[in-house]
Regions:
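An acidic-aromatic loop/edge-strand motif
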Residues: 28-44, 106-189
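Periplasmic/extracellular electron-transfer cofactor-ligation site
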Residues: 302, 863-890, 912-916, 929-931, ...
Length: 1003
């Protein structure tokens, strides 16, 4: 059933221009919208209807379509001829979620407006959020069509028939000092829709939620102010629901006919329990801010916990912290930890995940200064703990960023929904939000900085499916729900930011799964924090987090399809996929035979499986091999004729043995005939050599020569994903040919990932460079700077370019820059020392804001940028010839988020709002003095801070000397920057930001 707003009886507006959004490179994002114009229908009069319409073609894998509109008069909104809802008033835009109303491909969004007090004016912004973090916008402008007479089918217009004319723009919505209806503090894009729940006092009305036909959502309870925000939940054996409060402690709800009949505050001091689980009368709580896993026991079953035991204590941060817990089919507890949690000290040597390392062939020097730069392998991880013997704690799997939750399917397989690092979009190391099948001993490849494992690496595993824009929270399978079979078998994953619960349908693929996702439930706001199947067979979920309004909801199915719980017990005949999973599990459980491997049938199964066609089985077989002493099988590996087994064994040796013991089998790899290799084996061979050298250091001269001879002959490879790996390995071995072999790849590159990765790797070469090679790399960085990407993408471009410049002779650099100036963003010069003109106040400047639009000087704006030192820290324009810095937030689209007055206020008072990622930290040291700055990195027992973002100078503070550290509420951006500008220069500066944010005009 789709719930929509009942249309009002209003008159309205239409446009008919098709805006087609072409695919951009995977992993790229443009998150800044254009500023809408107010538009009118030509000749429209007071109390006369105006009609407007625009055609929109949806990109593939559309996630969310949000309509934002304001009108001088009453407005009604239509999608493909269907009335959706409406609003009135020009001071604040109304918001509507159009996702479920849109059709694949072409759509028409039409408006009808009637203003009894004057001509009808309207402004609108349509937000299209597509997969792979693509975001596009449609704003009202003169490209819309309009008319003042109604005709049949007007709300489905896709062309410009008789009677339609271009709409008449009457200025941007922020053109005057009046209130902007799209003011960002009042108006939130889809990603920030959770903020709508801040201070709302009541949870989102379920009648506004979108669900499949036959499903119904009920709001069981809205949290009262004293009940805090809710972040996790669990039913006990009596059907009572325990809710974890964001700050501390729990609530327990007792129900009577699905209504809350009793609420109890469980007076406990555990802080921020992100995970709750009942086993019998014991409640297990993963208390993030208490940094402990705790068991609370109600021995006499009287509803009071008499005993509290700390089962596991962990150190580290709390952002990506101690998350959900689940009970596995083996009876053990499975505990999800984000990458800020340091692995527990008592990890068992019997853990499935062993021998984890960074495995960076060429460590990147600025990885440690990036976000989460202190994170080391295994990063985010899943622990396994035996509740009967809590001392037995095993590392089950790792290589995650922040797995908030996990879920077992009906067959006992474990899954999670891991988070991306949104700053990395556009880079070759970007990992999307991904659904992962978690198997014993697996490393899913998350590493700090640029070191993320690529999905094709042999020593990691692929995702079940990638999800685009999202903020992952809870997950659950529909097992036991009174739903249709499709949804009983589905995995439900929760997207906190976009207000969605997605159903992921996992199809068997060999020993693992591949999935496709669909939106099951959505709302705005609907910041879902936890989800479970209740004892009544309904799907229960809660909203909350970040101090937002919480609600408890219940979803049931009342349609005509069968909804009895499925018999999930497998019956013969077993599928081939089930048999493949059984083989994978046997390999994961394999232990070294007590009598050695000679004559062992189990070991023979391991050895044969190294060449299995299924990647997951090969991975499990290599893990089993690593649990056997290498001395027992290395001689056999050296004589192995099958390339797949040889390469898998070589990777195992590289992970297990010292370099001198691994050299024989690595030398054997150099004698493999490359032309005989399947694609997987070619990838595996390069990865085995890379891991061996990353862990063991540079090889002997003989082995190095043999590897160079083999790989230089096959580089570049027709296997596209392999070329960056080959390039990296050849650079590490100081190949004399790799530079010349890579330049054609760079020149032909169009993807942002390739334009960044090759220069990133080649900058380590010390010899062989000439003017042309430098020019090709600088040109690639210039082209990369014109593509879309997130913050770390542009930081990487800047850092690579800076390092390349430092490695060049000034005369040579000047020659190169003369040939690529038009393509390369200029580095910001040192900020000039300017005399103060006047200590401006807001009261003096605000009355002049209406002059920003009138004939301002672009040259004056650029000069003001330099004089006010904006370019020393910020990227200020998409024009790559404008100087830029990267220490601060990207301002190239700032006026799309802030109106004139807000932008002026933020420049005048930088500490008004500070992005968490740019907050300074104050360190109080032993002598009582304070040092304040932005943390660059922590390493070697010291923290390195930059006290002045305009200087390259940093200061190291010994951690043992730190008495206290506290977050500063003072921005690193100094006050008074406008005091060096005249009034005209201030206005030119604001005009420059507005112009820089406008999308390019299409011919």
């Amino acid at each position: 059933m789709r719930n929509t707003v009942r249309p009002a009886i209003w008159c309205g507006v239409v446009i008919g221009v098709w805006l087609i959004f072409r695919d951009v490179a995977r992993g790229q994002v443009v998150n800044t919208p254009p500023v809408p114009d107010w538009i009118q229908a030509p000749g429209n009069k007071t109390n006369e209807a105006a009609f407007f319409s625009v055609g929109v073609e949806l990109p593939p894998k559309m996630l969310k379509v949000i309509f934002l509109g304001a009108s001088e008069g009453n407005m009604e909104v239509f999608v493909n001829g269907r009335a959706i809802g409406g609003g009135s008033g020009g001071s604040r835009a109304v918001s509507m979620d159009l996702t479920s109303s849109m059709d694949p491909g072409k759509n028409v969004i039409a408006l009808r407006v009637l203003n009894p007090a004057g001509p009808a004016r309207v402004s609108a912004l349509i937000e299209l959020n597509a997969d792979y973090a693509q975001e596009r916008w449609v704003a009202t402008s003169g490209r819309w069509l309009a008319r003042t007479t109604q005709q049949d089918g007007w709300s489905k217009v896709v062309t410009a028939p008789e009677g339609w004319e271009p709409a008449v723009p009457s200025g941007r919505v922020d053109a005057t000092g009046e209130k902007n209806p799209f003011e960002p503090r009042n108006l939130l894009d889809a990603y920030n829709s959770w903020k709508l729940a801040l201070g709302s006092g009541v949870a989102t009305d379920p009648s506004g939620l979108t669900l499949p036909a036959g499903f119904k959502a009920e709001l069981i309870r809205s949290a009262l102010p004293a009940e805090d925000s809710w972040i996790s939940m669990a039913f006990d054996s009596k059907g009572r629901l325990t809710l974890a409060r964001e700050k501390r402690g729990f609530l327990r709800l007792t129900f009577d006919k699905n209504q809350t009949s009793k609420i109890e505050v469980l007076d406990h001091n555990l802080l921020e329990c992100r995970g709750l689980l009942y086993i019998g009368t014991s409640l297990y709580a993963n208390a993030n801010n208490s940094k402990a896993l705790v068991r609370l026991t109600d021995d006499d079953d009287d509803g009071v916990f008499e005993k509290t035991e700390e089962l596991l204590k962990t150190e580290g941060g709390v952002g990506h912290g101690r998350n959900h817990i689940k009970r596995g089919p083996d009876g053990w507890l499975y505990i999800a930890h984000g990458n800020n949690v340091k692995p527990a000290s008592q990890i068992s040597p019997r853990s499935p995940l062993q021998r984890v390392a960074e495995d960076q062939l060429i460590p990147n020097p600025w990885d440690a200064s990036m976000f989460d730069g202190d994170v080391l392998a295994p990063a985010g991880h899943v622990l396994r703990l035996n509740p009967a013997n809590p001392a037995e704690v095993q590392m089950f799997a790792g290589g995650f960023r922040n797995p908030m939750d996990m879920a077992f399917n009906a067959d006992g397989e474990l899954f999670t929904f891991d988070a991306d690092m949104e700053w990395d979009v556009g880079t070759p190391w970007y990992m999307p939000n991904r659904v992962l099948h978690i198997v014993a001993g697996a490393d899913y490849g998350f590493r700090r900085g640029t070191g993320r494992f690529r999905q094709h690496f042999t020593d990691t595993l692929a995702s079940v499916t990638d999800i685009g824009l999202a903020s992952p929270t809870a997950v659950i399978f529909g097992t036991g729900a009174k739903f249709t079979e499709k949804y009983q078998r589905a995995m439900f994953i929760c997207d906190w930011a976009y207000g969605r619960i997605l159903a992921v349908h996992c199809g068997e693929t060999g020993a693992s799964f591949q999935g496709r996702s669909e939106v099951f439930l959505s709302g705005r706001p609907l910041n879902v924090t936890d989800i479970c199947v209740g004892p009544d067979g309904a799907l229960w979920f809660i909203t909350g987090g970040r101090a937002t309004q919480s609600g408890l909801y219940r979803v049931t199915y009342g349609g005509s399809e069968p909804s009895a719980p499925l018999n999930v017990t497998p019956t013969p005949p077993r599928s081939g996929a089930a048999e493949a999973r059984e083989l994978r599990r046997r390999l994961e459980a394999f232990e070294m035979p007590s009598g050695g491997v000679a004559g062992s049938k189990l070991f023979e199964e391991v050895w044969e499986s190294l060449a299995h066609s299924d990647r997951w089985i090969r991975y499990a077989a290599r893990g089993a091999l690593e649990r056997v002493a290498a001395t027992q099988w290395m001689p056999r590996a050296a004589e192995e004729k099958n390339n797949s087994r040889l390469i898998a064994a070589a990777l195992a040796v590289a992970r297990m043995e010292a370099p001198e013991r691994a050299s024989a089998i690595l030398e054997r790899l150099t004698r493999v005939n490359w032309r005989d290799l399947a694609e997987d084996d070619a990838v595996g061979l390069v990865r085995a050599l890379s891991v061996a050298f990353a862990r063991g250091g540079a090889p002997s001269s003989n082995l190095s020569s043999a590897v160079l001879s083999q790989l230089e002959a096959v580089y570049p490879s027709p296997i596209a994903v392999l070329n960056p790996d080959l390039c990296r390995l050849l650079v590490f071995l100081k190949s004399s040919k790799v530079l010349a072999q890579t330049l054609p790849l760079i020149a032909a590159a169009t993807r942002s990932e390739d334009l960044v990765e090759y220069p990133l790797v080649l900058r380590y070469l010390k010899e062989g460079w000439d003017i042309e090679a430098r020019r090709v790399c600088f040109d690639a960085l210039g082209r990369a700077g014109k593509l879309a990407g997130a913050q770390n993408y542009f930081r990487a471009i800047q850092s690579i370019r800076t390092e390349m410049e430092k490695a060049m002779d000034p005369t040579e650099l000047a020659k190169v820059l003369r040939t690529v100036t038009n393509n390369l963003a200029m580095k910001a010069p040192p900020p000039p020392v300017a005399a103060k003109v006047h200590a401006w106040t807001l009261e003096e400047l605000i009355p002049h804001l209406d002059k920003v639009s009138a004939g301002r000087s672009e040259a004056g704006g650029k000069a003001a940028l330099l004089k006010a030192q904006c370019t020393a820290c910020h990227r200020v324009s998409t024009d790559s010839t404008v100087a830029s810095g990267i220490q601060g937030p990207d301002l190239s689209q700032i006026s799309a988020r802030f109106g004139r007055r807000d932008l002026l206020e933020h420049i005048w008072n930088p500490s008004k709002v500070i992005d968490e990622k740019y907050r300074q930290t104050t360190f109080v040291v032993q002598d009582g003095s304070e040092i304040t700055g932005v943390v660059e990195r922590e390493e070697g027992g010291a923290v390195v801070v930059r006290q002045n973002l305009l200087s390259e100078q940093t200061q190291a503070i010994l951690l043992i000397s730190v008495r206290e550290r506290k977050i500063s509420n003072i921005s690193s951006m100094p006050e008074g920057l406008l005091s060096v500008l005249t009034l005209d220069q201030v206005l030119d500066l604001l005009a420059f930001f507005e112009t820089a944010s406008k999308p390019p005009v299409k011919p």
